[in-house]
Amino acid sequence: MTIHIALLRAVNVGGRKPIIMAELRDLLTELGFVDVRSLLQTGNLVFRGNARRGIDLERLLEEEAAKRLDLHTDFFVRNAEEWKAIVANNPFREEAKRDAAHLIVMFLKCTPSAKDVEALRAAITGPEIVSADGGQAYIVYPAGIGRSRLTNTLVEKKFRTRGTARNWNTILKLASLAED
């Protein structure tokens, strides 16, 4: 069985799209997945299931969450090997060591073009640094995320796709859960 990590977009953030993690775990169990675990209350799941392409699994989870839980949101799924590569390919290792909370990985529905990445970089007005790698973007927020004008909305607009972000601490915790 393949280990998968699923991230939900914008749940339990600022009172939007409230969901109880136990309900999500139960949903995945009802769908036939095993060893379903969650991390934090922001929609992070680790589970085992038969090998499927990430996009097929995302579609299944989105449809079933909408139908059974009335939860309309995006799911972003990576398998454990892909997750290891995300950790290994971090272009900002020094920044991660210095302040892991100020490094995020934004998971994207579609891979941005080089032109879109350059458009985002050109739109940055602060000290933020962006590096895109396939379906992920690594973003360093030296002055903190809360004060930055580089918002998820701006990233999505410039990349022309939806995404969800997790800080480096959460990325590493999910990597550890996927190894257990």
Residue ranges, per PLM feature:
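Surface-exposed, charge/polar-rich loops and edge strands
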Residues: 2-42, 46-180
